[in-house]
Amino acid sequence: PYGPAAGPNTQLAQNIIAAYAAGSRFFEVKTVQVMDGEELSKCVSKPCITAADECYNCEWSTELYVPQAFAEYVKAWFACKLLAKELELGDPDGFVFNMSVGYDLKGIQSPKVDAYIEGMKDASGTEVWRECMDWALANLDRFEKVDEAYVRGITPHVSNSITESTLHGCPPDEIERIATYLITEKNLNTYVKCNPTLLGYEFARKTLDGLGYDYI
């Protein structure tokens, strides 16, 4: 399966839904960190990517507050489950949401980010999950193939995998500490992201050229 990496394209529910309808099945939802919302916007000018073609996505984390980002991802998850059944877009369990968190262990262990991780692992006790469930049950007449049993059977386990995102210059032992924490304490299938800025210019240049992107 393929799909969008964490970025502006996986920040809002409607963008994730559009990607799913277009054929994507693996979604790395936009990175969250302890610095969010207004605090982040004062630190980093947004948006910090503008491109008419392929580009490096070395952007920071979500422009939303962490609870807002969580709500977007849950809404997208629920909507994709409904669309999979209603529009017969394939196995309703045939797509994956992959969390992305950064950028240091202290921030990832903060109550804010920890609540996000636990909510993505099981959203059943959250307000946004109840809102999605209530809406779907109240609007069953809009569907032809979705019934009450299907809606109530939608799993609240939005994600059991996570991508560790770190900034260039992050010490290797810090990367290892984060990965160890996510695997052993959070019990998550863990990916370590190697951004172009971490790989070095020569490797990134050779890789792009080899794929035909020599004009970048």
Indicate residue ranges for each PLM-predicted region:
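Active-site entrance/lid segments in N-terminal catalytic domains of soluble metabolic enzymes
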Residues: 1, 5-216
